[in-house]
């Protein structure tokens, strides 16, 4: 395919047009008085949202050079969302500001490499200054406040706070659509996996159709159990204890399943069999998780173990297990806390190195199940459009809250970025490096300027007053008042603010140091097919 190439100023100018189109669309959503953006969808009703990354991902420009600029800013938003889960609009605003200020200086003859050095030094200083003024977040009320600010709903703040209290910081909190109009919280404590009993005759409660096992033993294997003789010695040992047994296996079939069911019906033995969760290597990992949680051993050929040789020491134990037709929940496994902690640490290290979103999601699920449970926030709304918008807000709030617990909080509304200006300005740099520092100084003002503009105020006036206000005092754009930001509950997680600044500086520097851009030339439109011979042209308009 033929290529179209632009150089130097032409290349940068084309990319900046794309940066502006995307940033101008996204930045109208910033702050408590931010506006909404309506996105056309191929199917169904349009999506109304003020979520920066959702808007950025939808934008595709016709001009290839402009589209590359837009996609780079979209990458800033996506990267910030991946790291911190929020702050995507702030990152977009900062990127546009650094690109614009930088381009003025590059056009005037400044060296882009020197400017990039200055931007990197100033950004690193600003990040350290942000960390220095951070305040830790602890306690249910503080967590609820962070979530309420991000979601713009006190009720959502309460749900997220309660969910995090119930399942811990490592617990999985999922967001689903409710069948009703109300938003509600549901918590499943213990380890749950999506496999139910293999026979309905194994239930202990015929009304609810569930099997409740109190203080059971657990046999865990990745093998298929077809011959009852393979597990008979073990069954006899368990029978002597008069305690129930849960069998988790690749499958239970052949003569084994009817034999177990028959003994259950006769009241000889309380046993429930379920299939192992997951597939392939993920199944092996999940079985190992269950074994560690319950203090058992996975009977597997990988360890040279056979079912017929298994002893009572290989069985896991738990306080209670509930099995229905679709799922199994293990509560209070008997595994050692040290072994569980080591397993959690291993999964966390795998999370840090994985590049697959799917693998990351599955690892987080495993982490949550080991750490204590799963909370589900079921979102209700009067219309489908409102439901989609509410789900996006709650996702942002949940991510922001986790980030706040992890690294602490600073004054919100862009106030913290103004606070660190003094530290950045104190950097002693020369030449183009100093120019890079000054570009960052100007960009740090931009989020406050945009928040004020969206609320109907003059940004420059607000910034001047903010610079001369006591530490911690900021402008509440929702009410038009000057307040103590943290006491009022207007806060931002440090992780969100620093990620937005770091990602913006990184991509903006790349754009400023771009000297050539290569794009695909548009393909010429294919000619219309020739009309069949003898066909009357008038016939084409007959319908």
From Swiss-Prot:
Q: What is this protein called?
A: Chaperonin GroEL
Q: Which UniProt keywords apply?
A: ATP-binding, Chaperone, Cytoplasm, Isomerase, Nucleotide-binding
Q: Name one GO cellular component term.
A: cytoplasm
Q: Which Gene3D superfamilies match?
A: GroEL (3.50.7.10), GroEL-like equatorial domain (1.10.560.10), TCP-1-like chaperonin intermediate domain (3.30.260.10)
Q: Does the keyword Nucleotide-binding apply?
A: yes
Query: What is the reaction catalyzed?
Result: ATP + H2O + a folded polypeptide = ADP + phosphate + an unfolded polypeptide
Species the sequence originates in: Streptococcus pyogenes serotype M18 (strain MGAS8232)
What's this protein's function? Together with its co-chaperonin GroES, plays an essential role in assisting protein folding. The GroEL-GroES system forms a nano-cage that allows encapsulation of the non-native substrate proteins and provides a physical environment optimized to promote and accelerate protein folding.
BP GO annotations: protein refolding
């Amino acid at each position: 395919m033929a290529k179209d190439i632009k150089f130097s100023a032409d290349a940068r100018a084309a990319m900046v047009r794309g940066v502006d189109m995307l940033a101008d669309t996204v930045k109208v959503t910033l702050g408590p008085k931010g506006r909404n953006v309506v996105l056309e969808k191929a199917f169904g009703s349009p999506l109304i949202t003020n979520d920066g990354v959702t808007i950025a991902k939808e934008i595709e420009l016709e001009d290839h050079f402009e589209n590359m600029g837009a996609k780079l800013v979209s990458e800033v938003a996506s990267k910030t969302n991946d790291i911190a889960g929020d702050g995507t609009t702030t990152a977009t605003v900062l990127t546009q500001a650094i690109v614009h200020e930088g381009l003025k200086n590059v056009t005037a003859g400044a060296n882009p490499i020197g400017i990039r050095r200055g931007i990197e030094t100033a950004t690193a200083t600003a990040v350290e200054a942000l960390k220095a003024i951070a305040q830790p977040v602890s306690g249910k009320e503080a967590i609820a406040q962070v979530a309420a600010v991000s979601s713009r709903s006190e009720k959502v703040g309460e749900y997220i706070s309660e969910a995090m209290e119930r399942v811990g910081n490592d617990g999985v909190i999922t967001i689903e659509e409710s069948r009703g109009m109300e938003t509600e919280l549901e918590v499943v404590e213990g380890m749950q996996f999506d496999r139910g009993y293999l026979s309905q005759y194994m239930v202990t409660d015929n009304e609810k159709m569930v099997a409740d096992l109190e203080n059971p033993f657990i046999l865990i294997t990745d093998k298929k159990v077809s011959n009852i003789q393979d597990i008979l010695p073990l069954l006899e040992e368990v029978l002597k204890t008069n305690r129930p047994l849960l069998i988790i296996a690749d499958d239970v079939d052949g003569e084994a399943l009817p034999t177990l069911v028959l003994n259950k019906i006769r009241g000889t033995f309380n046993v429930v069999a379920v299939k192992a969760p997951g597939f392939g290597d993920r199944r092996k990992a999940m079985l190992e998780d269950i074994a560690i949680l319950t203090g058992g051993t996975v009977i597997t050929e990988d360890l040279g173990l056979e079912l017929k040789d298994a002893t009572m020491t290989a069985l896991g134990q738990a306080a209670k297990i509930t099995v229905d037709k679709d799922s199994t929940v293990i509560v209070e496994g008997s595994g050692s806390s040290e072994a569980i902690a080591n397993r959690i640490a291993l999964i966390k290290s795998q999370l840090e190195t994985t590049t697959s979103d799917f693998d990351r999601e599955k690892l987080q699920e495993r982490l949550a199940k080991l750490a204590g449970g799963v909370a589900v926030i079921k979102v209700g709304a009067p219309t489908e459009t409102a439901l989609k918008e509410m789900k996006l807000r709650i996702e942002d709030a949940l991510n922001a809250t986790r980030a706040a617990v992890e690294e602490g909080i600073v004054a919100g509304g862009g106030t913290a970025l103004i606070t660190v200006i003094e530290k950045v300005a104190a950097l002693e740099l020369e030449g183009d490096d100093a120019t890079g520092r000054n570009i960052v100084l100007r960009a740090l003002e931009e989020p406050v300027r945009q928040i004020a503009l969206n609320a109907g105020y003059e940004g420059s006036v607000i910034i001047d007053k903010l610079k001369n206000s006591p530490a911690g005092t900021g402008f509440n754009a929702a009410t038009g008042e000057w307040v103590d930001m943290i006491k009022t509950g207007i806060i931002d997680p440090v992780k969100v603010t620093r990620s937005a600044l770091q990602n913006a500086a990184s991509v903006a520097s790349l754009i400023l140091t771009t000297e050539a851009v290569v794009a695909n030339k548009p393909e010429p439109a294919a000619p219309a097919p020739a009309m069949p011979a003898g066909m009357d042209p008038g016939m084409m308009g007959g319908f």
